[in-house]
Amino acid sequence: MNIYIKTMREDDDKEVVAQACTSLADIVRDCGFAIIEPYITRLADATLILLRQESCCQQVESDGEDDGDIDHDEVLMDAVSDLLPAFAKVMGSYFDPIFTKLFDSLMKFAKSPHPPQDKTMVVATLAEVAQGMGAPISAYVDKIMPLVLKELASSEATNRRNAAFCVGEMCKNGGAAALKYYGDILHGLHRLFADSEPDDAVRDNAAGAIARMIMVQPQSIPLNQVLPVFIKALPLKEDHEESMVVYSCVCNLLLSSHPQILPLVPDVINAFAQVVVSPNESDEVKTVVAKAVSHLISVYGQQMQPILSALPPAHANALASFANRR
């Protein structure tokens, strides 16, 4: 660990420092907080120096930045920013005092003249820190949300995708601090469900954001307007890391017989049938979906038969097979 810290601070090769940061993030995720606890203050200081662009590798003089220098900077800062979510994942809420020290230096990368890829690096980092740190992110919501809302309308698909993921995590973990932004968030996300959105992963992450919002603040969502758009976006096409949260949200609404979801049951069943035949979805996700279908059959009986009969035979058989495992 001492060698990693020394490399971060003193090595003059950006590629070497980037690799040290990447390796360190992997070690933290794999081994947990215990292994870094004795070093956490020094690790945080080394990370801060890199975010401030004051380490040895960032001070090397050159005759001007060429494309290679810019590429090296991007690789380096991606690796540095990846340390923050790694720390947050293993430290949880205890990461907050360290994040406070790093926050302003991280946010500078989202300001001009930094390029779009720096902005989305910041947004992705914030999303994963919120995911790992939990409730303490609420103290940062007012500083983060203006950036993320703007990024929802970025011309870059990666930026829109990360922004959608970030607003979902901010709403999930930001508590009351995030509530006042719900209207603006829903407006920004709505564009990502439109036919004009060309990127499936963006739409999948928008669905993930809506799911998180519904699960934490259902009373703050106009479900009669949101659910038809949300359900129409299913099944997820590309980012299956969002599958569990999205389908769990839908299933919770079904299991509670929420009045706004019931008219959409035919569309939900059609999406669920595609989920259970998809090679890209886990058995865990398929089991969650099947449980909800079994519930609907047990509660609504004959009313479900026309819906199930309208499915392609292969889909209907797969859905029945999973439902019967329960």
Where in the sequence are the language-model features?
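Karyopherin-beta/Importin-beta family HEAT-repeat alpha-solenoid scaffold
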Residues: 1-326
